[in-house]
Structures are given as C-alpha cells and as structure tokens.
C-alpha cells in the first residue's frame, strides 16, 4: 500500500492489469531487441506477487490472483460497474456469459463478492493516490473520476 503512494506519480494508475500484460506482450513480440524480448517474456511468465520474497525452491510462495481472484474478472467487474453503473446482479449475469467455459458460475460469484468487498473496504487507499494520467474511459482518481467516501462500507453493496 505505502509503496504505491510514495512513488509521487502513478504512470499506470488507470491502465488495467490485464491491459498491461497485453502491452508488455506486444512489445516483447515486436521489439528487435532479442535480449529485452526474453526478459519481458520472463516477466510475463512470472506470477504476480505482492511480496518481494525470494522463491522457495524456485516456487513463488504468494500469488496475488490466488488471494484476490483473476485480474481479468476484476477488470471486467470494475469497468462495467464504473463505466455503466451496472448492479452486481447484472455484472454476475454478464460475467457468466462472457467467461463461459473459462470460469464456472460459483467461481465468478466468489470473486465478484470478493471484488465488491475489496472495492468498498479499500477506498481509503485512493485518498492519497499520486497524480497520474487518465488513459481510458474508466479511472478511480478521487480528484475527478470517482468521488466516494474513504470509509465506505461494503455491506450495503454485498
């Protein structure tokens, strides 16, 4: 939490994690610098971890998506909730159709509930968000995009 806010400028603050992966992959596949391409592909093959812990026997011990759910689901929920104001029930129905064959209904429900809980209970982190560009049509900047109390309770939404 602190490291994200101490950087003073959030260069990727409105770029979804799933899009970052595609951008890195695109650059890795199109650069003429073979060494850079290898490094970028290695980065893409490494699971995202919240801790800078060394791997134990070559295995990362803590993976973010194991804790919070797949980024593609979170980005989907966030986009349609903020951009179009869709309620939780509609997000669930849309996600079931969109991710049919990828995630079962129970998995989507589990991570949708987790998303709502985390989204509303972690608003205090946005209050001290550093400056950064708005890249897409959805952003969570407290200065112009999403105005919401820092102490919002998730119970009303879950």
Name the predicted role of every residue range.
Residues 1-158:
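ATP/NTP-dependent adenylation/nucleotidyl-transfer catalytic domains that generate, transfer
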């Amino acid at each position: 939490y602190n490291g994200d806010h101490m950087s003073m400028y959030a260069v990727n603050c409105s770029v979804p994690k799933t899009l970052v992966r595609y951008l890195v992959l695109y650059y890795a596949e199109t650069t003429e610098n073979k060494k850079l391409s290898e490094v970028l592909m290695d980065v893409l093959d490494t699971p995202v971890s919240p801790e800078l812990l060394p791997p134990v026997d070559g295995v990362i011990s803590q993976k973010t998506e194991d804790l919070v759910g797949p980024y593609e689901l979170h980005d989907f929920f966030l986009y349609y909730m903020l951009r179009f104001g869709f309620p939780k029930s509609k997000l669930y129905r849309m996600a079931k159709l969109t991710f049919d064959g990828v995630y079962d209904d129970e998995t989507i429900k589990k991570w949708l509930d987790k998303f709502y809980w985390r989204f509303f209970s972690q608003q205090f982190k946005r209050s001290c968000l550093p400056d950064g560009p708005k890249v897409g049509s959805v952003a969570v900047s407290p200065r112009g995009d999403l105005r919401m109390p820092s102490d919002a309770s998730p119970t009303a939404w879950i």
